[in-house]
Amino acid sequence: NIDQSFPGFHGSEMWNPNTDLSEDCLYLNVWIPAPKPKNATVLIWIYGGGFQTGTSSLHVYDGKFLARVERVIVVSMNYRVGALGFLALPGNPEAPGNMGLFDQQLALQWVQKNIAAFGGNPKSVTLFGESAGAASVSLHL
């Protein structure tokens, strides 16, 4: 395991290739301001990476500050990327393509069904992202 980060160079650690990743990746992160809100706006973050790389667990994507300062609930999701998420083999039901987008859709459905238990308003949800995450937002509209 080679450490390819550059300590002291701002922003370099966020792309550290030594971040633990797994095919078992369908997880959500939920940040709630204290005290627990009632009917709060929900912001859902989708990370970028060209649909090839990325994870919501990078420190730069920590939603606790946004949740605390703006009194909103912040949710981020992981989804399959690369061949596991976007390989399409026409005629092969085991690789229909765009599985990463279906992972995102599943996360969005989960938020709609469960966010009220966290103090969120399922009718006040905003999607946002960068790069492939922003493209994903447009694909879900």
Swiss-Prot record:
Glycans are attached at N39. Its main location: secreted. It comes from Macaca mulatta (Rhesus macaque). It catalyses: an acylcholine + H2O = a carboxylate + choline + H(+). It is found in: Secreted. SUPFAM superfamilies: alpha/beta-Hydrolases. Homotetramer; disulfide-linked. Dimer of dimers. Its EC number is 3.1.1.8. One of its GO terms (molecular function) is acetylcholinesterase activity. Esterase with broad substrate specificity. Contributes to the inactivation of the neurotransmitter acetylcholine. Can degrade neurotoxic organophosphate esters. This is Cholinesterase. Substrate binds at G49, G50. It is an enzyme of class 3 (hydrolase). The active site is at S131. GO terms for cellular component: extracellular region. The modification Phosphoserine is found at S131. PANTHER family: ACETYLCHOLINESTERASE, CHOLINESTERASE. It holds the Pfam family COesterase. Belongs to the type-B carboxylesterase/lipase family. Present in most cells except erythrocytes. Keywords: Disulfide bond, Glycoprotein, Hydrolase, Phosphoprotein, Secreted, Serine esterase.
